[in-house]
Amino acid sequence: MPYLDQVLREVLRLYPPVPVNTRTAHKTTILPTGGGKDGTKPFMVREGENVAFCVYAMHRREDLYGPDAGQFRPERWDEDLLLFQNERTATWGYLPFNGGPRACLGQDFGFVEAAYTVVRILQKYPIVKPDMYKGDIQGRKWLGWSSHQPEGIEMVTEERQKMTIVLSLGDGCRVTLGR
């Protein structure tokens, strides 16, 4: 199961459920970094101002995830990632479920539920590519307020007439039985 854990982490890294997030400052504060030309100077945020952060872009930072940060490579979670070299990036460099006191309360449940679903599908059905795909299956990238693929990638069991499984980040997993 360690590899499944790595696969799920990598999927959530590349396609976070909420790719862009915003917060409103309730009081004037100074952030320790984000100012100046190189982003290393303090930055003042006034009361009432909105601060947006892009998890989608952060999860593709080469300084945290290596030179292949834009590629799907689950094995990266088994390595000594740059992400874990200091406490701040280890805590705030991977945010598919947000972080701090506003982190998703259901993240552990969601992770276990996703792992269970993937395992049960793989145990029960041999998955093959549909005839329409000749090479690698490439999904269409989509970025909005919620990460989803408008067109699901269709995967079919060997006995196509009995079952079709459509995987789509936007709609969850739909299973259609029958012909």
What are these language model-derived features?
Residues F53-F84:
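Conserved cytochrome P450 K-helix/beta-meander segment immediately N-terminal to the heme-binding cysteine loop
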Residues A90, Q107-Q161:
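Cytochrome P450 heme-binding "Cys pocket" and the immediately downstream C-terminal segment
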